[in-house]
């Protein structure tokens, strides 16, 4: 029982080491890897090589698949190029299996020792994250060594020998058992290594080992499908395409397993080595053969998994990819893109408010809907950022994290103000049949145009962080405040002149001027985050 526990813990250590390498590489090179994948989709050979290269770095075809899946889910990459990258990822993980199964036992303690020094010494820096990668690689090599050590006494047990002796060559049964190995161990690499060790010990025959390897590859596809079962239709299509490619490859090669085993058995290599080499060449040949069929497979997957119909018209988060949370740069970019969507909705609210001011009361209902949409997006962004490992963020990432939270909150508060403004105009002006004076309406229009311009500039500053634009936004904020004050005095002058329309709408008019001032402050606050200096007049602003 203790020996079995050692084996399970070694497999768990292998999975954990792979996770550490993936998160470390993604935190250092995540944005670059994402760029490489997104730019490689134009040509199939380039996309295939990108899948191999990225998987070699992150030590996991599942990680590469998750990246590509997020692209497809956000409509950044078409399904066919995504499937090409996934095929490349399958080859990449097989090649890394060959490299990691060389005798590198001397390298494991060295990587762990150096990695710990760098990671603990400079945890938040690039060097610290590279140290994290070193620790992960060291743990992977250590886990592989422990698996071999743990399997040896297990294979000598009579009960185990009887169980594996039942694998007498039923190719479908053997392949299913291999798939179960991969799913249970959460790693096709662990399943392949276990198969190689059992073969070297003479517990299973070479043909059975080949079936187990084929099944392990199929199991990794099933694992990806299970991981994406709750994802949207676009993401599930990628996982389905990958699984179908592996299933087709398995069905093609399984009838020839005994012939392959007989041919490979003539090579003067240890059986365990042959199992690993078969794993590499099987994936390489399968993926190269499948490359010409990615377009038909993409069409087939779209037929099987159709887009879900929109059951409601409420705006939903689109860019908050949960798989990117371990990579701060990517997660922050996703949250920023979602904040830009709030900005777009805010712009629609401003346009709707202007229509209400000009006598279209039906737009007030649309304002309420947009305010609800913005609240949904803001809540999603807030919860998404709360799930990030904030204590591991670098200083620049922490600053950006705070900027996104502040900007999304300001826009959410602004939406509440605009919704209230629309309701008050509809109730106090339109329903009561009290129109603004011509001069008053012109002034409100001028402030509206300036406010809308400031909103657009603010979103640009938020996204780009451009200092010149931030200074321009700050100056524009001051000009708006001066203009607002001037129009407030002009309204009072009209009251002195006994303008009937101004008198009837006075409280509403002055209230709108105050609300617009608050909106302007909320929109323009992003300028100070970029400039990182307080404004001398900031204390006089209304928020």
Swiss-Prot record:
GO biological process, alphabetically ordered: phosphate ion transmembrane transport; sodium-dependent phosphate transport
Where does this one sit in the cell? Cell inner membrane
Pfam families, from UniProt?
Na_Pi_cotrans
Q: Record's family? A: Belongs to the YjbB family.
Q: Which Gene3D superfamilies match?
A: Phosphate transport system protein phou homolog 2, domain 2 (1.20.58.220)
According to UniProt, the name of this protein is Putative inorganic phosphate export protein YjbB
| Organism of origin | Escherichia coli (strain K12)
- Drop me one GO molecular function for this one: sodium:phosphate symporter activity
Q: Quick one: a GO cellular component term?
A: plasma membrane
Q: Which PANTHER family match?
A: PHOU DOMAIN-CONTAINING PROTEIN, SOLUTE CARRIER FAMILY 34 SODIUM PHOSPHATE , MEMBER 2-RELATED
Query: Which UniProt keyword terms apply here?
Result: Cell inner membrane, Cell membrane, Membrane, Phosphate transport, Transmembrane, Transmembrane helix, Transport
Topology in the membrane?
Multi-pass membrane protein
Role summary: Might be involved in phosphate export. Overproduction of YjbB reduces the elevated levels of polyphosphate (polyP) in a phoU mutant that accumulates 1000-fold higher levels of polyP than the wild type, suggesting that YjbB exports excess intracellular phosphate (Pi) in the phoU mutant and thus reduces the levels of polyP.
Spell out the reaction equation it catalyses: phosphate(in) = phosphate(out)
From the UniProt record, list the coiled-coil ranges: none
Please give the start and end residues of each transmembrane region. Answer: 1-21, 48-68, 76-96, 99-119, 134-154, 175-195, 196-216, 240-260, 274-294
Q: Which domain of life is it from?
A: Bacteria
């Amino acid at each position: 029982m203790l020996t079995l526990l050692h084996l399970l813990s070694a497999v768990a250590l292998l999975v954990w080491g792979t996770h550490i390498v993936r998160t470390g590489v993604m935190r250092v090179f995540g944005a670059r890897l994402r760029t490489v994948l997104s730019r490689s989709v134009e040509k199939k050979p380039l996309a295939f090589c990108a899948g191999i290269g990225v998987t070699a770095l992150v030590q996991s075809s599942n990680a590469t698949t998750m990246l590509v899946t997020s692209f497809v889910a956000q409509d950044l990459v078409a399904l066919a190029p995504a499937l090409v990258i996934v095929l490349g990822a399958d080859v990449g993980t097989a090649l890394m299996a060959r490299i990691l199964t060389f005798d590198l036992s001397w390298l494991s303690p060295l990587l762990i020792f150096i990695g710990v020094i760098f990671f603990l010494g400079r945890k938040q820096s690039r060097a610290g994250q590279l140290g994290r990668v070193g620790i992960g690689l060291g743990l992977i090599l250590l886990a592989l060594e422990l698996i071999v050590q743990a399997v040896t006494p297990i294979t000598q047990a009579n009960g185990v020998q009887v169980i594996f002796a039942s694998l007498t060559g039923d190719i479908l049964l053997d392949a299913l058992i291999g798939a179960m190995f991969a799913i249970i161990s959460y790693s096709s690499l662990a399943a392949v290594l276990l198969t190689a060790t059992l073969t070297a010990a003479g517990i299973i025959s070479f043909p059975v080992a080949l079936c187990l390897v084929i099944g392990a590859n199929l199991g990794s596809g099933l694992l990806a499908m299970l991981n994406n079962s709750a994802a949207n239709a676009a993401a599930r299509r990628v996982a389905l395409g990958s699984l179908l490619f592996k299933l087709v490859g398995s069905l093609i090669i399984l009838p020839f397993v005994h012939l392959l085993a007989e041919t490979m058995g003539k090579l003067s290599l240890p059986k365990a080595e042959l199992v690993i080499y078969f794993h590499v060449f099987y994936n390489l040949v399968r993926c190269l053969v499948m490359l010409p069929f990615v377009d038909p497979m993409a069409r087939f997957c779209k037929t099987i998994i159709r887009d879900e119909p929109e059951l409601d018209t409420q705006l939903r988060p689109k860019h908050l990819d949960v798989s990117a949370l371990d990579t701060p740069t990517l997660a922050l970019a996703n949250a920023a893109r979602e904040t830009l969507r709030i900005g777009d909705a805010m712009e629609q609210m401003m346009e709707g408010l202007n229509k209400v001011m000009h006598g279209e009361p039906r737009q007030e209902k649309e304002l309420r809907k947009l305010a609800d949409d913005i609240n949904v997006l803001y809540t999603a962004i807030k919860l998404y950022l709360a799930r990030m490992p904030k204590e591991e963020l670098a200083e620049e990432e922490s600053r950006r994290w705070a900027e996104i939270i502040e900007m999304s909150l300001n826009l959410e508060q602004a939406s509440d103000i605009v919704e209230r403004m629309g309701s008050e105009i509809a109730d106090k002006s339109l329903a009561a049949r009290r129109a603004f004076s011509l001069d008053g309406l012109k002034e409100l229009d001028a402030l509206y145009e300036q406010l809308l311009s400031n909103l657009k500039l603010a979103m640009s500053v938020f996204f780009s962080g451009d200092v010149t634009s931030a200074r321009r936004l700050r100056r524009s904020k001051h000009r708006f405040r001066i203009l607002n004050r001037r129009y407030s005095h002009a309204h009072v002058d009209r009251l002195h002149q006994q303008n009937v329309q101004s008198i009837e709408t006075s409280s509403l008019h002055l209230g709108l001027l105050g609300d617009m001032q608050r909106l302007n402050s909320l929109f323009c606050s992003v300028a100070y985050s970029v400039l990182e200096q307080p404004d001398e007049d900031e204390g006089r602003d209304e928020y």
